[in-house]
Amino acid sequence: MGARKGRVLLAWELGDGLGHVGRLMPLATRLERDGYVPVLAVRDPAQALRVPAARRLPVLQAPYATPRGARASGFHARSFADILCVIGYEDEERLRAMLRAWRDLARLVRPALAIGDFSPTLALALRGSGVPVMLVGSGFALPPAQDGFFPEVNAEGRAIADREHLAASMRRASGAPRDATPAALVAGDWQGACTWPLLDPYRASRARPAIGPLGPTQAAGP
C-alpha cells in the first residue's frame, strides 16, 4: 500500500434520502484507491449509514440549518435563492454561525480537498481558505455561477428572496468583496451536475454541460 496523501472531506448539507451519499461513495472509493483518506460529514448519519460502503469510513455530523417557520412546510422554491433564504442566508448572524461551524469542522479534519453534495454553505465557508471545493449534485442543486444571480427554474414556485438583501448578507457574513455575486459565492472551484443534460434545469445557461450520473446509488443495508 502506498503512502497516504491526506484527507478528503465529503459533505452532504441539504436534502434528504440516500441519493446524496450515493453520489459521494463512488468518489470516496476512488479516492481510497488513490491513497486518500475519505471522511464523511453528513446531514443525517443514520441515513448515511444505511449505505453499506459508508460504514467503513469516519462519519461526522455535518453542520446544517433547519428551515424555519411557515417556510419549512409545503414550500416550493422558484430559484436556488429561495432555498438559501429558507435556511437563513438573509439573516447575517445565523449565516455567520453556519459558516463558523463549517470552518471549524474543516480545521479539525484538515482536508486536502472538500467535496460537497447539495452543500452551498460548505462552499461559501471554504471560499479563499486554500482548500479546493468540488461540488456535485442534482442539476437544481448546482446553479451555474456565470449568471451572477440564480436563474428561476420553477415558475410555479414561491419567490421569497430579496436579491439585494441576500447578496449583502452573504458578502458581509463571509467577508467577500462587494462585487461578489451570490451564485459565484457558492459555486466552489469545480462543479459536476450529476444528471443527464436533457434533464438539467440550467442547461441553457450552464457553461459546462451536466456530466450525467456518477454511478448507481448503493442499496440500503438491513
Task: List the model feature ranges, each with a label.
Residues 132-208:
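Active-site-proximal region of nucleotide-activated glycan assembly enzymes
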Residues 42-48, 117-121, 194-200:
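Short, polar loop motifs at secondary-structure junctions
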Residues 33-93:
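Conserved nucleotide-sugar phosphate-binding/catalytic loop shared by glycosyltransferases and other
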Residues 201-222:
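Acidic anion/phosphate-binding donor-loop and adjacent secondary structure
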Residues 75-115, 119-121, 158-182:
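Conserved nucleotide-sugar donor-binding subdomain of glycosyltransferases
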Residues 7, 112-113, 190:
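Structural motif
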Residues 62-68, 138-143, 215-216:
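Short, acidic/turn-prone active-site loops that include or flank metal/cofactor-
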Residues 12-25:
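A short, glycine/small-residue-rich beta-strand->loop->alpha-helix junction that serves as a flexible
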